[in-house]
From Swiss-Prot:
PpiC domain ranges (all copies): 171-272, 282-382
Any one annotated GO CC term: outer membrane-bounded periplasmic space
Record lineage: Bacteria, Pseudomonadati, Pseudomonadota, Gammaproteobacteria, Enterobacterales
Annotated gene: surA
Record-given protein name: Chaperone SurA
Gene Ontology terms: biological process: Gram-negative-bacterium-type cell outer membrane assembly; protein folding; protein stabilization
Main location: periplasm
This protein's record includes keyword Repeat: yes
Enzyme Commission numbers on file: 5.2.1.8
């Protein structure tokens, strides 16, 4: 089974109060600006990370190291949640219900099955909902704040699209794990040297067979640390430029790094690679139609019957489709062209129109079809395959640039927020 409790932003749920003795008074683990992180938050996340790691067969570091990583994660979450509160970010119950339903669907569960599994694992459903709501707020704040700092220029899109079309590794997808050894803002040369030595030591451990996931949980300052540094699948161009260059010749199982960036030293493990065809073609259809719109002088049934009559006249040779369209069609954009809609991909049409059109054979006329616009008589004139590789490459290039810049900028943004916040850790 997928690690379904962590599907949304890698969150591990806070366990219910049955894990703690009722007589123990909750303590403050850290003060974060005008808020706090509670010991119960840390303990709950510790329980959940251990539960998830056990299910996944993932090794964990000692409790002190794991606790430090969890506390840092909760501090960062608290900082972003406070920003969300100031910004007035709200997640409606409808949005929350949809997100939870999607999590259940991704794991082939009904909502009742999901509730049962939560209860089995000792997780309160109300607590789960609240935590998902928090994670959605964190995601929205981070996405909004980081994206507005990003600009993708047309020249960048064109250059990357050209690269996608010419490089052999343009379609390569990699499954990666990541460790970040962070540097403070404006680090001294001594701090840089210390971080580099630590990163090199971790690389050596990993290459000598140490569990990379455990190393990530132990040392990484990245947001994916508690997931063992797992980044999942992505195309090489979606990665920060310094990663893409270093991974251009990487093979499955390779440990890559340390790679220096503005936020620290990065270490990558290539879990797997896979390729994908670069040629992209789509089917276009050439169709024409006659549209009748229900009105006070022609109701739905009358419109449908009129189209049946027109269809019979066309099939008997009394008239042609083009002539009937010019005479009867109420679509001002195509009536004068004999109902001709030109070449287009089916997905641009109304769903009911599209579904009827895709079932037709060349030269076939449909029965009357009802859509949001009215009643249609549709004829499929022809189909063709069109190479859309260039357009698809530009679209992919834009998304890759956004993902790449987001990844780079998000690390910087989070470092800035952590540095500017007042944080006092009260527990060891």
């Amino acid at each position: 089974m997928k690690n379904w409790k962590t599907l949304l932003l890698g969150i591990a749920m806070i366990a219910n109060t049955s894990f703690a003795a009722p007589q123990v008074v909750d303590k403050v683990a850290a003060i974060v600006n005008n808020g706090v992180v509670l010991e119960s938050d840390v303990d709950g996340l510790m329980q959940s990370v251990k539960l998830n790691a056990g299910q996944a067969g993932q090794q964990l570091p000692d409790d002190a190291t794991l606790r430090h990583q969890i506390l840092e994660r909760l501090i960062m979450d608290q900082i972003i949640l406070q920003m969300g509160q100031k910004m007035g970010v709200k997640i409606t119950d409808e949005q929350l219900d949809q997100a939870i339903a999607n999590i259940a669907k991704q794991n082939n569960m009904t909502m009742d099955q999901m509730r049962s599994r939560l209860a089995y694992d000792g997780l309160n459903y109300s607590t789960y909902r609240n935590q998902i709501r928090k994670e959605m707020i964190i995601s929205e704040v981070r996405n909004n704040e980081v994206r507005r700092r990003i600009t993708v220029l047309p020249q960048e899109v064109d250059a990357l699209a050209k690269q996608i079309g010419t490089q052999n590794d343009a379609s390569t997808e990699l499954n990666l794990r990541h460790i970040l050894i962070a540097l403070p803002e404006n680090p001294t040369s001594e701090q840089v040297n210390d971080a580099q030595r630590q990163a090199e030591s971790i690389v050596e451990e990993a290459r000598n067979g140490a569990d990379f996931g455990k190393l990530a949980i132990t040392y990484s300052a990245d947001q994916q640390a508690l997931k063992g540094g797992q980044m999942g699948w992505g195309r090489i161009q979606e990665l920060p430029g310094i990663f893409a260059q270093a991974l251009s010749t990487a093979k499955k199982g390779d440990i890559v790094g340390p790679i220096r960036s503005g936020v620290g030293f990065h270490i990558l493990k290539v879990n797997d690679l896979r390729g994908q065809s670069q040629s992209i073609s789509v089917t276009e259809v050439h169709a024409r139609h006659i549209l009748l719109k229900p009105s006070p002088i022609m109701n739905d049934q009358q419109a449908r019957l009129k189209l049946e009559e027109i269809a019979a006249d066309i099939k008997s040779g009394k008239t042609t489709f083009a002539a009937a369209a010019k005479e009867y069609s109420q679509d001002p954009g195509s009536a004068n062209q004999g109902g001709d809609l030109g070449w287009a991909t089916p997905d641009i049409f109304d769903p009911a129109f599209r579904d009827a059109l895709t079932k037709l054979h060349k030269g076939q006329i449909s029965a009357p079809v009802h859509s949001s616009f009215g009643w249609h008589l549709i004829e499929l004139l022809d189909t063709r395959k069109v190479d859309k590789t260039d357009a698809a490459q530009k679209d992919r290039a834009y998304r890759m640039l956004m993902n790449r810049k987001f990844s780079e900028e998000a690390a910087t943004w989070m470092q800035e927020q952590r540095a500017s916040a007042y944080v006092k850790i009260l527990s060891n």
